[in-house]
């Protein structure tokens, strides 16, 4: 418990907090309750944190580990930009093209048609700092990790060598827009999203999010794919079950 308290008082400051309030409540009542619960908390000095930047990767990182797990798993990752970079939206769309929904490329081709994977997913970290585009999956019975990796790489090479079609790109954009709209129906999601956008910039940015995704072009996706899906920018982990 002492370690928890020490961590809390070192890194958590209400000076940094963003309070988002939604629902049937007046401004006056919001102010009253905020002052009631937060005003008594004393302000403390905020230490300046100097976080080291990760060294640029210049060669592929690869590792194989064996553990007492029921199934083999393949993990691949590629360095990407921060959420504040203009290319962030292209990365998010690339991950959706790869594995968001039954008609996405990895799901349709490698899971449903070729049956090389029992499950396969692609997603981005979405952090304020530079992050990773992740690809993780569990190969089907009888499929080696080498075969699984080769199949994924073939799909990535297709993104690098060709342009995403207009219909496929529009489908992904429409899906994102509908998710945004329905995701902001309930009060909790609205408050969470407003707080996040205020923390990372300004709350009004939430109204520009759909436009930011809509502005991504096939040419931008092609450029980002070529820059990203390179061996020297990638990390590969074979997570194998032990032969007991």
Task: Identify the role of each PLM range.
Residues 55-56, 96, 107-108, 167, ...:
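A general, composition-driven signal for non-globular sequence regions
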Residues 100-116:
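M16/MPP (pitrilysin/insulinase) zinc-metallopeptidase core fold and M16-derived inactive scaffolds
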